[in-house]
């Protein structure tokens, strides 16, 4: 029931797992970059419904591989949409220099950077890119070439068998997480350094 309700919420927000996965894996420019999730986030029309879907999927007691695939992609696209809603102040669906990025941008609208970083970095959080990376690696493990995966925040190492396309998608989550980590290092240094790191989150700059 929770998977069905989560799918409904996500669908209302514009998220279809198969079309999202197809677009992620057919991005010829940078299939292993955070950019793919920001491209996918352009299709999302309602962040609140994405958040509801993430919360519902987190409550599954015995998730299948399909569930892990769904919720890891869901969390990654939700993270990208959250970043866009918070920092794309000129509302052109991308992170660029005209955006008014500072240490407190849209803190009342979206969580503060500290809260957001905790959400995206902690494996205990359903919104976490760390968790999404680990669960996506588990979901895709099974066929293809043997690869080693290293999670972006806690450096959890695993070995698995993946097709090149699937490994690229796992690494895209890793790239997103590493960019978030870099932004957090810059946070508090100077507004200029932090803004530069935020603008690089979508992998376009």
Where are these regions (language model features)?
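Long alpha-helical scaffold regions
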Residues: 63-69, 73
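"A position-specific structural signal for the A-helix of alpha-solenoid helical repeats
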Residues: 3-11, 73, 77-78
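Short coil/linker segments at helix-helix boundaries
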Residues: 10-64, 80-199
